């Protein structure tokens, strides 16, 4: 099972709404918001955590005050429940993936880059595949590979401790395959076409994932959820 949730980042969130939503996340996260130079970075960080909290509250029936985020030795967040999650954001979109197996997700806005950097950072087999693409699709293909590689690294949970060229993506088969030390990795890769101008990939460290659910949310829905939760707490006689 993989549940994907995504929300569009508004150009502006009313200050009172932002403060209310912020009150539903950890003090550590709240303190981090004031350090952001770009307010939209704070929006992205807030919305990412709220997506996870929404799932835990509504699906697992966990009270918001009982949700505590921790980090492993490599900095990947986790919770003390039988669930795995990962968050990514790029420009105007925030996405998260939730699963009963380790999972990673990455979204990137397609932007102009020098394709030659792929030769430096990618595995040689990936660079050969990239060079085989039509010139007008190479940039899009670059971000296709990049998001798959990022989602795999994030699923493992070791961040950049895993060299990005220590494994390679085989796009020449009916399904996307990852090889590490010439051995096929037991993973499942999804590449949902969510939004024009973006690439998104999701990786599960389980080879037989068959159930994928994708849900688009509005900021107002998150507001309503936490308003309802607050009202219930204040009227719990």
From Swiss-Prot:
Source organism of the structure: Aneurinibacillus migulanus
Q: Is Transmembrane helix one of the keywords?
A: no
* Keyword check for Ribosomal protein: no
Q: Which family does it belong to?
A: Belongs to the P-Pant transferase superfamily. Gsp/Sfp/HetI/AcpT family.
Q: Which GO biological process categories is it annotated with?
A: antibiotic biosynthetic process; fatty acid biosynthetic process; lysine biosynthetic process via aminoadipic acid
Q: Care to name a GO molecular-function term for this sequence?
A: magnesium ion binding
Write out the residues that bind Mg(2+).
106, 108, 150
| The enzyme's E.C. designation | 2.7.8.-
Name of the molecule in the record: 4'-phosphopantetheinyl transferase gsp
What is the annotated signal peptide range for this record?
A: none
Catalytic function, reaction form: apo-[peptidyl-carrier protein] + CoA = holo-[peptidyl-carrier protein] + adenosine 3',5'-bisphosphate + H(+)
User: Which is an annotated Pfam family here?
Assistant: ACPS
Q: From what superkingdom does this record's organism come?
A: Bacteria
Q: Could you say which enzyme class this protein belongs to?
A: transferase
Keywords, A to Z, come to:
Antibiotic biosynthesis, Magnesium, Metal-binding, Transferase
Q: What does this protein do?
A: Activates the five peptidyl carrier protein (PCP) domains of gramicidin synthase GrsAB, by transferring the 4'-phosphopantetheinyl moiety of coenzyme A (CoA) to a serine residue. Required for gramicidin S production.
Per the UniProt record, which residue ranges are transmembrane? none
Enumerate the cofactors the protein uses: Mg(2+)
One GO cellular-component annotation of the UniProt record comes to:
cytosol
